[in-house]
């Protein structure tokens, strides 16, 4: 199946990509992971905190599992992703496909 995905992080922006996946669930999983990777690329920049900065700001000990859990919750709240079935009549979908050199990235 063919999809258009958008993924990103609050306060930074987003990316769009044309993908082909076996089903909607796999497309959603890929978009979710892409959002995490996108955010990770900005850690320490534009106000995106890394784990040490998060712990310092929230006065948490970096050695506790609870600190990691709180950090992961923060990340989940910052990232976003959307998956749309490809519609060849949708201008935005066609633009995304064109930016992908007319190809769907197989996931």
PLM segments and residue spans:
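A short, exposed loop/beta-hairpin motif centered on an aromatic-Gly-Thr core
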Residues: 13-24
């Amino acid at each position: 199946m063919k999809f258009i995905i958008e993924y990103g992080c609050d306060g930074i922006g987003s990316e769009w990509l044309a993908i082909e996946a076996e089903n909607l669930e796999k497309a959603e999983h890929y978009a979710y992971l892409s959002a995490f990777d996108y955010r990770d690329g900005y850690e320490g920049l534009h106000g995106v905190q890394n784990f040490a900065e998060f712990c310092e700001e929230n006065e948490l000990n970096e050695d506790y599992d609870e600190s990691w859990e709180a950090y992961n919750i923060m990340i989940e709240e910052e990232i976003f992703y959307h998956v749309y079935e490809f519609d060849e009549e949708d201008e935005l979908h066609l633009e995304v496909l064109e930016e992908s050199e007319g190809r769907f990235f197989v996931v």
